[in-house]
Regions:
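Terminal accessory regions of large proteins
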Residues: 4-256
Length: 256
């Protein structure tokens, strides 16, 4: 990847400078997210979409996410999981043969220990949005729906592709599915605790406490999302990021 990172990127002309490899890799990740949403395309220069009529013919090499919702979870629960999509992006650009090597290169540049996909996932959960806010000077074009400190649910949408039914889609297709997973996992843990040894019970009980806290958090969050989903809110892009973000502030990450 060191030799190839000048690929198709114009946000894109990412040339790796040894002075700050981490910054360049974060720029590549930002560009990849732009491609996932269709803001950028590997097939056309500059902006591919920033509002108006959608032109699917601009996207051949890497197809944008269909519903404009990219879940950011602690595991690959959804088909359009953001880490899974990023891995696919790297594979499309640099090839399958060097995929693992390139993911390792990216993970090492981000810093941290562990498997490359885990490091990349941790960056999306904990670092990506802060970087996005810096780049866009607290006027984010990607919006982070965030349930809270327990990380029970997060997802990104692209503001310019927002539709009145976007919130309802987040609720029914993602939050409800995640709630179901928590219920299943909690029931499973309770069963395992009943038949576990004393030392194993301590470990499983800690996991159960964490899951129950996440389930409580997402239940409260679902109620907030439900309220907004029912309103089918329309936004006007001409009103600007700050005005539109404020409408959804109760369910979006705080801008710091």
């Amino acid at each position: 990847m060191q030799d190839e990172l000048t690929s198709e990127v114009e946000d894109k002309d990412v040339t790796v400078r040894k002075a700050d490899l981490g910054r360049e890799i974060r720029s590549l990740i930002s560009y990849a997210v732009g491609c996932m949403f269709g803001r950028y395309s590997l097939d056309v220069p500059g902006l591919a979409y920033a509002g108006g009529a959608w032109d699917a013919s601009k996207y051949k090499t890497f197809i944008p996410d269909e519903d404009n919702v990219l879940p950011i979870c602690d595991d690959e629960y959804f088909e359009d999981d953001i880490v899974g999509r990023f891995v696919k992006f790297v594979e499309v650009i640099y090839g399958k043969e060097t995929l693992e090597e390139n993911l390792r290169f990216i993970a090492d540049a981000l810093g941290g220990k562990g498997p490359s996909r885990k490091i990349i996932r941790n960056y999306f959960i904990n670092g990506f949005y802060a970087d996005h806010l810096k780049v866009y000077q607290k006027r984010p074009i990607y919006w982070l729906f965030d349930s809270g400190k327990k990380n029970s649910f997060k997802c990104l949408i692209y503001m310019h592709r927002y539709q009145p039914d976007t919130i309802a889609r987040i609720r029914t297709d993602y939050i409800h599915e995640q709630q179901s997973r928590y219920r299943t996992a909690i029931a499973d843990l309770k069963q395992r605790i009943n038949g576990a040894s004393t030392s194993e019970k301590v470990k499983l009980s800690k996991q159960l406490t964490t899951l129950q806290a996440q389930a409580d958090e997402i239940r409260v969050y679902e109620e907030k999302i439900h309220h907004l989903a029912d309103r089918m809110i329309r936004i006007d892009l001409d009103d600007g990021v700050k005005h539109n973000y404020e409408i959804f502030k109760d369910v979006l990450a705080k801008i710091k």
